[in-house]
C-alpha cells in the first residue's frame, strides 16, 4: 500500500507544479524530521479513540508514518525521468493512469523495491508503534512485542525461547533481501550522480 500510494503521490507532486503541490511536498519532507517520540502519545490516544488499534488500523498508521521518506525518494527519482517518454505515451492514446502504470511505474521499479525493503525492515522490526497502539491486552502482537513478553519479572529471561523467536524473525528479512538484492543495487546505482 505504501508503494502504490506514495509513488502516485510523488508522481502528481512532481509533474503538477502549483503552490499547493509545493506545500504538500514540503509537508512530506517535514514529516521526516519530526521524531516519532514527539507525536507518539497523541497518536496513541487518537488511534484508540478512532478504533485504529487493530491490524487494519496499523496498516493505515504505517502508511501515514512511512509516506514521508517514500514520497521523498520517489520524487527524487521521478524528476530524473524525461517528460518525452510520458508525452509519447499520451500521443499514443494513454490516459494519465495508463501512462503512470504502463510507462512510469516500470521505470520506478528499482526505487520501488528499495522503498519496499526499507519499509518492510522498519515495519517488521518496529516495537514502539504496535506496543503503544495495539497494547498488551489484545491477541494481536508483533514479534518484537512477544520477545519483550519473554522477559519475566525481576529480570528472569527465557533465553532459549527468545533466541529461537529472534532467529525466526530474522529469516524472512534475509530471504526478502537476498531475493531483491539485484534491484537494491540497481536502485543505488540509479540514484547515483553521474559524472
Explain the meaning of each model-derived region.
Residues 1-195:
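A structural signal for multi-pass alpha-helical bundles of membrane permease subunits
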Amino acid at each position: 500500500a505504501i508503494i502504490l500510494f506514495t509513488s502516485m503521490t510523488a508522481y502528481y507532486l512532481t509533474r503538477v507544479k502549483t503552490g499547493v503541490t509545493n506545500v504538500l511536498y514540503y509537508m512530506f519532507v517535514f514529516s521526516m524530521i519530526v521524531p516519532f517520540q514527539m507525536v507518539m502519545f497523541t497518536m496513541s490516544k487518537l488511534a484508540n479513540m478512532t478504533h485504529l488499534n487493530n491490524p487494519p488500523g496499523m496498516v493505515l498508521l504505517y502508511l501515514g508514518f512511512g509516506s514521508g521518506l517514500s514520497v521523498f525518494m520517489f520524487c527524487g527519482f521521478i524528476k530524473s525521468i524525461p517528460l518525452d517518454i510520458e508525452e509519447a505515451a499520451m500521443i499514443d492514446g494513454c490516459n494519465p493512469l495508463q501512462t503512470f502504470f504502463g510507462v512510469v511505474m516500470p521505470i520506478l521499479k528499482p526505487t520501488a523495491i528499495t522503498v519496499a525493503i526499507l519499509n518492510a525492515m522498519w515495519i517488521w522490526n518496529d516495537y514502539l508503534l504496535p506496543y503503544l497502539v495495539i497494547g498488551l491486552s489484545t491477541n494481536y502482537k508483533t514479534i518484537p512485542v512477544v520477545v519483550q513478553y519473554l522477559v519475566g519479572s525481576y529480570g528472569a529471561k527465557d533465553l532459549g525461547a527468545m533466541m529461537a523467536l529472534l532467529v525466526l524473525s530474522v529469516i524472512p528479512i534475509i530471504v526478502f533481501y537476498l531475493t531483491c538484492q539485484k534491484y537494491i543495487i540497481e536502485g543505488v546505482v540509479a540514484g547515483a550522480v553521474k559524472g
